[in-house]
Amino acid sequence: MPSRLDARATRHYFDSAFHCPAVKVLPNEYYVAAGEDIMISTVLGSCVAACIRDPRAGVGGMNHFMLPEGDGDSPSSATMRYGAFAMEVLINELLKAGAARERLEAKVFGGGAVLSAMQQMNIGERNARFVLNYLNTEGIPVLAQDLGDVHARRIGYFPRDGRVMVRRLAPHHHKAEVLIAQREQVAAQTASAKAHTPPQIERFSAPAKPRFERFTRPSTATS
């Protein structure tokens, strides 16, 4: 099972549009910045990203999860692909970096149905509903949200001041990024299907009854 350190985003680059250092968060990853002048970016399809910060401490971060919750009894549910685990990891890492729980505030994005053939799965809708319910339960106010619909999104989050730049991606203008979001949704569908498929059990038929060779009664000797 991957550790939290393994799930921390490591793809740093310089964003020429915003003229600042940036880090790209992929599905099942997170990133936390404490006082850094950095942009945290991601591309979302049916996945959801929660951007959470403590404005007083200047500590903020983002996660990117594929599904709301796993089977609590399964070790595989404790991975960043599931929202329940991804939210816990992000909040705990923020607190470790100096944030105070009572000052946390959130902005949430994603949950789109970017592939019409998969809209019946409602993965994006389930993710969106999950993140809002989770934050409400934890008492973390949601200051902004852009959830649902049929668009892929590119998110740029500036944890130092809380700004978020959202671009809805039109397929004919942003083919590469929309393709990423579509692949993400296919992966989420596959993971969801596997999570709800019961383990296959090989059934053994009852052992065949042993065959006995029956001996006929010896015939009576005749004189």
UniProtKB/Swiss-Prot annotation:
Q: Which key words are in the record? A: Chemotaxis, Hydrolase
Catalytic activity entry? L-glutaminyl-[protein] + H2O = L-glutamyl-[protein] + NH4(+)
Q: What is its EC number?
A: 3.5.1.44
GO terms under biological process: chemotaxis
Q: List the CDD domains hit by this protein, alphabetically.
A: CheD
Concerning Pfam families, the annotation shows:
CheD
SUPFAM superfamilies in UniProt: CNF1/YfiH-like putative cysteine hydrolases
Task: Indicate yes or no for the key word Protease.
Answer: no
Is Magnesium given among the entry's keywords?
no
- Gene Ontology MF term list: protein-glutamine glutaminase activity
For region Disordered, the annotated ranges are 189-223
Q: Which family does it belong to?
A: Belongs to the CheD family.
Described purpose of this protein according to its UniProt entry? Probably deamidates glutamine residues to glutamate on methyl-accepting chemotaxis receptors (MCPs), playing an important role in chemotaxis.
What is the protein's given name? Answer: Probable chemoreceptor glutamine deamidase CheD
Q: To which species is this protein native?
A: Bordetella petrii (strain ATCC BAA-461 / DSM 12804 / CCUG 43448)
Q: Write the gene name.
A: cheD
